[in-house]
Amino acid sequence: MSFTGKLAELLARPNQDPAGGPEAPWYLKYGSRVLGIVAAFFAILFGLWNVLSIIGLSVSCMLVAGIIQMLAGFVVMALEAPFCFVCIEKVNDVSKMVDAKPMFFRAGLYCAMAVPPIFMCFGLASLFGSGLIFATGAVYGMMALGKKASAADMRAAAAQTSYGGNAASTTSDRAGIVSNAQPFSFTGAVGTDSNV
């Protein structure tokens, strides 16, 4: 396969529906990819910043958290934009394998990769870099939940009771959840009040 054919195949993937995935609007499909690419770029950049700012600071905090954040950025970049790693053949295979899995797998993977650098070294660089990866996971999680019902379906479901009948709608100020509850007196003390 030629280089241009391979590049066209890699760029056409976001338009295809994932295997077994829910119907997602086009702006969520492309938006999640773009957010993932931007998140990976900033995670790599701020992870490198954490690693290079090791001089005079905590080794375990900056060095380890920065390396984990950079690795998370590279994984997200490899899964969201495998055309950035054209020279590595296995990246495309791994990306196709992850694309075949349900959306909640990718959402959980991204959220799980984003949390350790934030807990290991809480700072703006780790919060922003890993926070964007976590936001990408949250968008994939929303896509995994699927499309909500139409407004008419939600109104019909809200009007029904748990027994399947129609709920008696009331607009009284004294309507309550419990049918035999005594209302508070609006003019004075309740008759059973001990005035203590």
Curated annotation (Swiss-Prot):
Q: Which UniProt keywords apply?
A: Calcium, Calcium channel, Calcium transport, Cell membrane, Cell projection, Cytoplasmic vesicle, Endocytosis, Endosome, Ion channel, Ion transport, Membrane, Synapse, Transmembrane, Transmembrane helix, Transport
Which Gene Ontology cellular-component terms appear in the entry?
Answer: cell projection; endosome; presynaptic membrane; synaptic vesicle membrane
For whether the record's keyword set contains Transport, the answer is yes
Task: Report activity regulation.
Answer: Channel activity is inhibited by La(3+), which reduces Ca(2+) influx and thus inhibits it's function in promoting activity-dependent bulk endocytosis (ADBE) in response to high stimuli.
One Gene Ontology term from the biological process aspect of the record: clathrin-dependent synaptic vesicle endocytosis
Which is one GO molecular function term here?
calcium channel activity
Transmembrane residues, as ranges? 35-55, 59-79, 114-134
Looking at the UniProt record, the site noted as Calcium ion selectivity sits at 80
State the name under which the record lists this protein.
Answer: Calcium channel flower
